Swiss-Prot record:
Its cofactor is Mg(2+). It comes from Aedes aegypti. Residues 683-692, 706-719 have a biased composition (Polar residues). The keyword Nuclease applies. Possesses 3'-5' exoribonuclease activity. Required for 3'-end trimming of AGO1-bound miRNAs. It is an enzyme of class 3 (hydrolase). Pfam families: DNA_pol_A_exo1. One of its GO terms (biological process) is nucleobase-containing compound metabolic process. The keyword Cell inner membrane does not apply. GO terms for molecular function: 3'-5' exonuclease activity; metal ion binding; nucleic acid binding. Belongs to the mut-7 family. Coiled coil: none annotated. This is Exonuclease mut-7 homolog.
Length: 719
């Protein structure tokens, strides 16, 4: 190590107001040598007072104790190499990384006996070896060593021993540079003797350096040597989840124990925060991220890990119970507060959420119903789950006694009861005959549907799936509506293959000459991509798939001062039900939306709801189009501006009377395609709507349609 021979006494320096380089009064660390000089005197013979805690810190060079058994590694360069390296550093300052620097380093390594050893010596003499970035000199020295080894297929058997590997490890392990460490692992072939570094990783764990220990264990593939308490759980406590998960992905033996341990934090006898605090205290975890140690983020973590590692549900009982309690409370909120669940939807979702074996959750259901003064419903579920009468709330017990006193058995079937409150407001209904609503549950029906859809100029689409309360949702039903028919693809039973879904995407959804209507389609398309990867629907500002978001159209037409919906209503939320009110003057019954779409067969009400949910989109677009035409605004120009992700022009800019023939190329081209589909040049004078044009288009292909008619079953057979 290098020491200065001209160190002024600390007392004198204090009097002069200067502090020598390297002077510090901090506590010493394991890599520092401290010199305490009490009662020192100045060079003039004057004695000065010196404090006991004043110390001179002498920082050793990087090679100190770098080898096995704390042996030093000589980093000094002989005079010739030192002179060469000084010139090389000057060249690096000028040229940075590049062919010249690479060539000079390659030539240096070629003229040494052991390029592995000399690469470490050069690294140690780089001024930036303590913080080597990817464009630094220290990083470049080792990077070129890797290139040299690869180019000349240089082995390590005769040139690299365990001591040199330990030196290389100590040089880069403290830098926190993942790419640098992985490069050194590759150069010196650490994986041949990975057990050599286990004590070093344990030293890091003892120093509470969990992140560094975890990352090194991953890079050295040490997946059998550590348990969940060494650094995986502490990393979760520190919210350094990515490193912990990276390790768990390979350490399969720890996946189950870690998930079970995290699940134990949700034992209802104590709060999640209390369980975490106890673990932190017992294992002396430092740098804890307390703001993430509560129920919501940790429950999501447990569910994600359990899903990724295929952990059976019985290994996460506490999180499952918590999730079911939350789901039940959500159902109660929708039923009794929002009043948006009808009886059938409520019953099937309760049965799906409350299992036949979970007595605690069954009793919670009865209590919640009783709290809303719905004693008949509470009694119904008490008898359904055969709960002990003594465990029931007193109000429910009294209700059952009253029924028995009237010599009537407590009712378990409430089908005849007017369970849903009557509503005087009429609801919007499907105007198509049920014979035109088709359930597509086979390949033959699928391709008959596809033959019809390929001839359409405009369709509407929607989808339904079963709510899973935090789990993965999967599409159950896809609805496709034209003015004449509604097709409902039963995703769960149709047994369609990837090529079939790809054909639907190519021939309908990704065609720019077929206008597709939807309401907030991002969610539906995202579900398609997750559940049906081959059903690759392109929907972005760069695509030309002609998918129109009616919610986006709603926002744009409201900017025009002269635009009025056919039925003016004050709406707070821009949802589909409110848009139906504005355009069609009736409410949209959504009481079947939140129901079990995974059960088979589907109920009649579910099928009617699903068909109407798609068909009403056509009616909405038709109503908005007519209103725009009525106030002399060009619907086609607004449509193409939205499809091309261009801000629609102002009120005056879209008026037919004031519009010039010239327009931008991209918008005009897209408008020309749409004009060909809808023949606006002819229909604008005759007053025909887009529906009239669609009927005309379909009549042209009548011959083909007669050859490939859709053959049942329709809702007459399935409803």
């Amino acid at each position: 190590m290098s020491k200065s021979n001209n160190v002024a006494p600390p007392c004198r320096q204090d009097q002069l107001g200067f502090v020598p380089a390297g002077y510090d009064s901090d506590n010493n660390s394991e890599d520092e040598m401290l010199m305490v000089m009490p009662n020192a005197s100045t060079s003039s013979g004057e004695s000065g007072r010196c404090f006991d805690d004043e110390r001179i810190k002498i920082v050793p060079h990087i090679g100190w104790r770098a080898g096995i058994g704390d042996r030093d590694f000589d980093i000094e360069l002989d005079e010739n190499i030192a002179n060469w390296f000084e010139g090389f550093r000057d060249s690096f300052k000028t040229f940075k990384k590049g062919p010249l620097i690479s060539q000079r380093l390659q030539m240096f390594y070629m003229n040494t006996r052991n390029p592995y050893e000399w690469s470490l010596k050069l690294f140690a003499n780089c001024p930036d070896h303590n913080s080597p970035k990817s464009n630094s000199l220290a990083y470049t020295v080792l990077e070129e060593m890797r290139n040299f080894k690869k180019h000349y297929n240089l082995g390590t058997d005769q040139l690299v021993d365990d001591n040199l590997r330990m030196v290389a490890f100590n040089f880069v392990a403290k830098q926190g540079h993942c790419l640098l460490f992985r490069m050194v692992v590759d150069i010196f072939e650490f994986l041949q003797c990975r057990d050599l570094f286990i004590p070093k990783v344990r030293e890091m764990i003892a120093r509470k350096q969990y992140k560094e220990a975890g990352q090194i264990a991953i890079d050295l593939e040490l997946f059998e040597e550590f348990d969940e308490h060494d650094f995986v759980m502490p990393l979760f406590m520190q919210d350094k989840i990515s490193i912990a998960e990276d390790y768990l992905n390979k350490a399969e033996r720890l996946q189950g124990p870690v998930v079970q341990l995290l699940d134990s934090f949700f034992d209802k006898r104590q709060s999640v925060e209390s369980h975490c605090s106890r673990y932190i205290t017992e294992h002396e975890v430092t740098d804890v991220y307390y703001s993430k140690l509560h129920q919501k983020p940790l429950s999501k973590l447990v569910q994600r890990l359990a899903k990724n590692y295929n952990i059976p549900r019985q290994f996460t009982p506490n999180v499952n119970k918590m999730k079911n309690f939350g789901a039940l409370q959500f159902l109660v909120h929708k039923r009794y507060y929002e009043k948006s669940l009808n009886k059938d939807s409520w019953d099937e979702m309760v049965r799906d959420t409350v299992s036949e074996t979970d007595r605690e959750l069954q009793l919670e259901l009865v209590c919640l119903c009783s709290n809303f003064n719905d004693q008949p419903e509470a009694a119904k579920w008490a008898f359904h789950y055969q709960l002990k009468r003594s465990d029931l709330p007193l109000l429910v017990q009294d209700y059952i006694l009253e029924q028995e006193g009237n010599k009537q058995a407590p009712r378990t079937d409430f089908d005849d009861e007017q369970w849903d409150a009557p509503d005087s407001e009429p609801a919007h209904t499907l105007r198509l005959d049920e014979s035109h609503v088709h359930l597509v549950d086979s390949k033959d029906k699928f391709y008959a549907m596809l033959s019809d859809l390929c001839r359409q100029s405009m369709i509407a689409f929607d989808s339904e799936w079963k709510p899973t309360f935090g789990g993965a949702n999967e599409v159950s039903l896809i609805q496709l509506a034209t003015w004449d028919d509604v097709y409902m693809i039963d995703v769960m039973v149709s047994q369609l293959e990837p090529l079939d879904w790809a054909a639907l995407a190519k021939n309908v959804f990704n065609r720019d000459d077929v206008l597709k209507l939807s309401f907030a389609p991002s969610t539906d398309i995202s579900m398609f991509q997750k559940a049906l990867p081959s059903f690759n629907v392109m929907y972005s500002s760069q695509s030309t798939s002609a998918i129109l978001d009616l919610q986006l159209l709603w926002r744009h037409v409201e900017r025009f001062d002269s635009f009025r919906f056919p039925y003016h209503e004050e709406s707070v939320n821009q949802n589909l039900a409110n848009l139906v009110r504005l355009c069609l003057g009736k409410k949209l019954d959504k009481s079947n939306q939140f129901s079990n779409w995974a059960q088979r067969p589907l109920r009649k009400e579910q099928l009617r709801y699903a068909a109407l949910d798609a068909f009403c989109l056509l009616e909405i677009y038709d109503a908005i189009e007519k209103q725009l035409t009525h106030i002399q605004l060009d619907p086609n120009e607004i449509l193409n501006a939205l499809l091309n992700d261009v801000r629609p022009p102002s009120d005056s800019g879209t008026r037919r009377a004031g519009r010039q023939d010239g327009s931008s190329g991209s918008r005009r081209n897209h408008r020309d395609k749409y004009n060909k589909r809808h023949a606006y040049a002819e229909d604008s004078n005759s007053g025909n709507s887009s529906r009239a044009h669609q009927n005309r288009t379909k009549s042209k292909g009548a011959g083909l349609r007669e050859q490939q008619t859709f053959e049942g079953p329709n809702t007459k057979s399935v409803l």
